[in-house]
Amino acid sequence: MATYLIGDVHGCYDELIALLHKVEFTPGKDTLWLTGDLVARGPGSLDVLRYVKSLGDSVRLVLGNHDLHLLAVFAGISRNKPKDRLTPLLEAPDADELLNWLRRQPLLQIDEEKKLVMAHAGITPQWDLQTAKECARDVEAVLSSDSYPFFLDAMYGDMPNNWSPELRGLGRLRFITNAFTRMRFCFPNGQLDMYSKESPEEAPAPLKPWFAIPGPVAEEYNIAFGHWASLEGKGTPEGIYALDTGCCWGGTLTCLRWEDKQYFVQPSNRHKDMGEGEAVAS
């Protein structure tokens, strides 16, 4: 029994299947963890969702910003951008089934035995694990309810960008969503910066990558995340695993076998013909 962690798939179905074949992933025996952003930009978002859904209890995933944007398009809130290549998914006969399944997926995965936490963008250093759990549940409850379009319409935006237990309503939900799915850089006090996308070496002072700011979760747990392809899986402290290596941009799809920390990569089938972008407003 092995646990495989794979970075952002972004609709790269062929690469995902090739990578799982390479590691001899066996559903029912092994477990697959996915860092979110299953869809958009690659050509196979429909096949990715169908396959991941079919894995049942053999998969543990978290939602990413592109997944949330897809749900907003599905709900009629945001427009379908051609570059996201989502039309085959949105027009599929099983679209309702797939997307209603998708909106019931979590923002946070935790394995206490492995001391492993996974979120799409990471864990803000302003949270301890209990707070992260409670915050994830808040958004998950709204997404799985009948009022989810109201939340999706309000999730776009950069404020508030500083955590407070006193946050309420849509502002609280927006901060939680941004922290779990869009975060890259923080100010030294942990306040989110939602504008900078440079490499850590090029970021303006005093910004630091979220994982470079001490936080209570990273003190006790390993953290796996995706979202930040320009890191190329490098430059993180011990116990912090950056798994998005830009498959949809012409990079690779990366898999970490947890038990022995061995990495496997599958080269992209695409040329790097576009720069990194985001579907959710950043």
From Swiss-Prot:
It is an enzyme of class 3 (hydrolase). The keyword Chloroplast does not apply. Pfam families: Metallophos (PF00149). Transmembrane segments: none annotated. CDD domains: MPP_ApaH (cd07422). It catalyses: P(1),P(4)-bis(5'-adenosyl) tetraphosphate + H2O = 2 ADP + 2 H(+). The keyword Cytoplasm does not apply. PANTHER family: CYTOCHROME C5, PTHR40942. Monomer. NCBIfam families: apaH (TIGR00668), PRK00166.1 (NF001204). Belongs to the Ap4A hydrolase family. This is Bis(5'-nucleosyl)-tetraphosphatase, symmetrical.
